[in-house]
Amino acid sequence: MNARIYCLSDKILLGKTSNKSIQYVSKCLFSKGFRIDEIQILPNNVTENFDDITKFEGRQNLFVYLLDSQISYPQILNGICQKTGVEKTISNIAKTVIQSRYSSKNIPMPKESADCQFVPEGAYGVGNIYSDIQCVVLSRKNDFYLIMSNGEQEIETYLDKMLTFVLQNQPQYKQCQTFKTFGLSEQNIKQVLADLIKNKDKISINVYSDNLDSEIIIRSKSEQVAFNEYVGKVFSRLNKYIYAEEAITMEQTLFKLLSNANLCVSFGESITHGNIVNSLMTANPEFSKYIKATYVFQDAKNICDRISAKTSTIQNFGNSSVETIFEVSSNIINETGSDIVCGVVGSFENEVCKSYVAVGDKNAIHVYKNTFCAPFCEAIDSTTKATLFYLIKKLRQNDFHFDKKTV
């Protein structure tokens, strides 16, 4: 099924809030087998003809409308009703939820909130306890129209239930395989798999990317031998970029590997300013059981003082170099006695982040150079993920590609 997402949000357009909700919705749709054809961010007050944002016909489609404000609700509702020829009606569920919210506060109901009591006749609805914008799905012919609030709490609470209604009569996939990769963009992956994606065996291959962290989902609606052949080909072509063979994050993958092997790791960070360890602890506080020590280095003096690195090494090669991170990592693993060491140093200038990542044990430490061209926060995030990726590959297979210097 094809999907289009329309987010009506002045706040996102003005840069007052992030578009995390859009990312969450698109990833959720993708994981359930939807193909996302378009994502648009529009102002709260939609001035375009409604037909302009319901463009495609003749296929089974899902239109998702994420609303930031109550003023958008009647506009979208009226547009859907006019397009489908359905009348508006007051929903008892919406009426009860909205009226109880204002009666409990002992304040009159605004007109914008009263308008949110209306839904298309015959629509499926779920009462939203967090805001006046209700969760509504209308099914007409080949199309589904989903309206809901853009709030993260509402989306996390109600989206899955609404999509379950949409998919309840759809053919279910009987075979499914997921691969998680790092290091290739969505466009790069689609180029590598182009001939497999355009197949005649009705094997669905979809790619969803968050920067360089990607998810490839292979599906089939019937049991067939060809499915395993496609899985094998995808794995063969992307093997060196794959860090998991299920729909889990890097942090979840790393935790499974460390806990299963009962290994501890020590970290040394400069350019990432502690972001690596912070991302792990935020994802799962249980990581504390497997993190032996952490070092965050602010400058060259700090490196020398904390882990006894030679001043001459930094003077000769600089704060960010293969030699420096190798010596830093060697000293860390010797001083802490951890099973694994993981270190990163780097520099950021003119939206170019150059870093050196060291991963290894007492037998061998290997250093990898990464270059990311992006704004600071995005570059640090990519450097953090690249570091975790190398660590995962070390723990999984010890299959480093020593001739590769950039991700």
Region locations from a protein language model:
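Conserved hydrophobic helix-helix packing surfaces used for dimerization/oligomerization
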Residues: A3-I5, Y145, V265
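Glycine-rich beta-strand-to-loop/alpha-helix junction loops that act as flexible
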Residues: L8-D10, Q60-P74, K221, V344-G346
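Accessory alpha-helical/coil subdomains and C-terminal extensions
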Residues: R140-L212, R219, A226-F227
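Glycine-rich phosphate/diphosphate-binding loop of Rossmann-like nucleotide-binding domains
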Residues: M1-I41
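Proline/glycine-rich low-complexity loops and linkers
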Residues: E48-T54, G58, I71-V166
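Short alpha-helical segments enriched in small residues
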Residues: V46, V225-A226, V231-V407
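Gly/Ser/Thr-rich loops at beta-strand to alpha-helix junctions
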Residues: K11-N19, L67-Y73, N150-E154, L212, ...
